[in-house]
């Protein structure tokens, strides 16, 4: 039998088979998910831990103020979770007219009045309470540790970080959290996200799991 041993691809891939796989766009997040598996946690625990780390290492794409969605099969039943933030209760036509004038026809582009109530963190708590095995504090531990110790910024994240600085730096709290040196972190620079670590610790205190 003739067989062509020439590999048509520039690199070779070794097939790996496993019972548990955690896949993310950042290795530290995948590592956090796997660590929950090693602790005896399940897929929900791993997903929450990985998602929390993503808000630290890729905050320009996955922030604590984001939304969350989940489709989960528990072995018997399919569950769906929609944690897209709802509109704040005060968002009425009169509210925007009082604050931005009678000609205001839409919410502003930036600032607190431009976003819905964040749903991501509350979704983590809800999923952990109903489907998780590990304490919620354990799930947040890797993200808090990385935020406090710091991590090295990759090129793509640095580019996204630096792009909107001129537009966002005047917003309350933005510069303190994201521009501690008065600028976006450089590629390869160690960034310590202490504001996010503080926020995650506060959430642990309010969670009932």
What are these language model-derived features?
Residues 1-31, 35, 43-206:
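Noncatalytic scaffold domains of N-terminal-nucleophile
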């Amino acid at each position: 039998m003739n067989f062509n041993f020439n590999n048509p691809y520039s690199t070779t891939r070794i097939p790996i088979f496993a019972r548990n796989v955690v896949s993310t766009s950042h290795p530290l997040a995948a590592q956090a998910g796997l660590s929950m598996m090693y602790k005896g946690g399940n897929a929900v625990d791993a997903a929450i831990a990985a998602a929390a780390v993503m808000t630290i290492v890729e905050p320009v794409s996955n922030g604590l103020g984001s939304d969350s969605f989940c489709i989960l099969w528990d072995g018997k039943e399919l569950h769906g979770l929609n944690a897209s933030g709802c509109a704040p209760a005060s968002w009425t036509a009169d509210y925007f007219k009082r604050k931005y004038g009678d000609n205001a026809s839409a919410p502003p582009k930036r600032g607190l009045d431009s976003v819905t109530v964040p749903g991501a963190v509350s979704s983590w708590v809800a999923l952990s309470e109903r489907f998780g095995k590990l304490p919620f504090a354990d799930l947040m531990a890797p993200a808090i540790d990385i935020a406090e110790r710091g991590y090295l910024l990759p090129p793509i994240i640095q580019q996204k970080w630096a792009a909107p600085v001129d537009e966002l730096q005047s917003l309350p709290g933005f510069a303190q959290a994201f521009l501690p040196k008065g600028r976006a972190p450089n590629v390869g620079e160690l960034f310590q996200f202490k504001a996010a670590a503080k926020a995650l610790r506060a959430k642990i205190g309010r969670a009932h799991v």
